[in-house]
Curated annotation (Swiss-Prot):
This is ATP synthase subunit b. F-type ATPases have 2 components, F(1) - the catalytic core - and F(0) - the membrane proton channel. F(1) has five subunits: alpha(3), beta(3), gamma(1), delta(1), epsilon(1). F(0) has three main subunits: a(1), b(2) and c(10-14). The alpha and beta chains form an alternating ring which encloses part of the gamma chain. F(1) is attached to F(0) by a central stalk formed by the gamma and epsilon chains, while a peripheral stalk is formed by the delta and b chains. It holds the Pfam family ATP-synt_B. It comes from Lactobacillus acidophilus (strain ATCC 700396 / NCK56 / N2 / NCFM). It is found in: Cell membrane. The keyword Transcription does not apply. Induction: By low pH. The chain crosses the membrane at residues 12-32. GO terms for cellular component: plasma membrane; proton-transporting ATP synthase complex. F(1)F(0) ATP synthase produces ATP from ADP in the presence of a proton or sodium gradient. F-type ATPases consist of two structural domains, F(1) containing the extramembraneous catalytic core and F(0) containing the membrane proton channel, linked together by a central stalk and a peripheral stalk. During catalysis, ATP synthesis in the catalytic domain of F(1) is coupled via a rotary mechanism of the central stalk subunits to proton translocation. Component of the F(0) channel, it forms part of the peripheral stalk, linking F(1) to F(0). Keywords: ATP synthesis, Cell membrane, CF(0), Hydrogen ion transport, Ion transport, Membrane, Transmembrane, Transmembrane helix, Transport. Signal peptide: none annotated.
Amino acid sequence: MTIQTLFAASHHIYLGNAIWYLLCFAILMLLIKHYAWGPVSDMMEKRRQKIISDLDSAASDRKKAETLANEREAALKNSRQEATQILSDAKTNAQNTSKEIVASANEDAAAIRKKANEEAAKAKSDALDAARDQVADISVAIAEKVIAKNLSAEDQKDLVDQFIKGLDD
């Protein structure tokens, strides 16, 4: 046997097997296309649609999160401004209240001083009136005694001293 005959015979066997393999492969492909390709293709399409939907949903959620973050940032900034305004108003109110309290206290103190001065002036006036009355009474009493009896200078001095001692008691 020569190499050509071996090659020809072996080539012929391989060609027959190759045709058979091709035929089986073609039948297998037709069966796959008919029974499996549709469901696999549908499954791949559903998967593609789900991925697209998930990406769209993620983008939407990200936009919502950004919007919410911006709203919260704005609310935080607004609340800080409100807190600053409240503190400012509280300080202003406290200063105004303090001024009002001091003014009221000054008015009360002035009224108390005025009343005390008036009372002191009245007490002084009353004391002076009482002293005048006593001096007048003493003068009248001395005059009565002097008139009732003619006294010497020594007797007059003793009489005045007795009246002064009587005032001390």
